[in-house]
């Protein structure tokens, strides 16, 4: 598989006042994201994960180093719209992403702005709304919807552009448990359909669903690997003020007490399967 995103020795520093000490939000990060993969980037508030996300499609530009999206340098102004069409982004607060008074018009906004034919736009809108199970709300006003429904509309707006990659920047942070579950099911479905997913989250039970987990701490990469590898490093994870998933924590406890628990037991489903063997 080829890489859809390459991050090369990225540094990022936010603008600061004359009396303020400069502080790097990202410090020398290098990553390669394979096309079709599902990566979760986690970390405490202030770890740099959302700053990293915004560098991935040119919302922020490197202070040093480079980010390439399908070979395009995010600093190339002539390529910025191609970059954002390739790597779409869904934000934490859907209200920041909804722009129209009617749901179907909101989903159509992106395709309209990249010059898609009106007949094709209608087809894309219907397809995108069906993908997020919101087809029956197409003529509703977004402000009348729940937080989870609004987030689904925001996702549909990105899907309608048909990006190869979608960056989700804490998309469930403002939702209740049911809303979180619904959004994660949509994200997993999009990944199964071939879209590259980059999920920024602080929920460990979401991160374990990825193929790869990257832990950010103080602007740097602390850990990078499969969920099985990353969540077995419980002491290192706790040093970054994070918790391991409950299932992984139970598995670690069982291993410490002489039970041979396989390394892939990091989710509730895998733990249940393992425990059921002892019935």
Where are these regions (language model features)?
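The feature captures the beta-strand-to-loop junction immediately N-terminal to the Walker
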Residues: 42-44
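Conserved ABC ATPase "signature" region
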Residues: 119-137
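Helix-to-loop junction immediately C-terminal to a conserved catalytic motif
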Residues: 57
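Catalytic Walker B motif of ABC-type/P-loop ATPase nucleotide-binding domains
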Residues: 166-169
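Conserved ABC ATPase signature
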Residues: 141-145, 149
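Conserved ABC transporter NBD signature motif
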Residues: 65-75, 83
